Amino acid sequence: METVSIDFGKPCRVYFMGIGGVSMSGLAEILWKEGFTVSGSDARESAFTEQLGARGIQIYIGQRRENLSSPVDYVVYTAAIHPDNPEFLEAKRLGIPMLSRAELLGQLMRCYRESIA
């Protein structure tokens, strides 16, 4: 896959596959606070998906290709997402630029003068 970069100065629509984990939910919340339109899915509900949903973020429980029917500019996925995941396959079919959680985290960290690993 080619390298995908998000322009953090231009909020857009980002979909998170696996949004219910501690790391992905935190990244989703950061982008949401920066004015991005955030949505995502997870295999099961969690305190994190409930918290994001309470903020008005669209959360899908279950990962189905139909979840990507609304316009999305970027997809972020976790290492837990397999290449045969229906959403992963649909994002590729639609040509949506995709980046891993680690790639997004690295890009975000470059926006700050100091960071803690």
List the predicted regions and their residue ranges:
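Hydrophobic alpha-helical hairpins/lids featuring a short glycine-rich hinge
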Residues: S115-A117
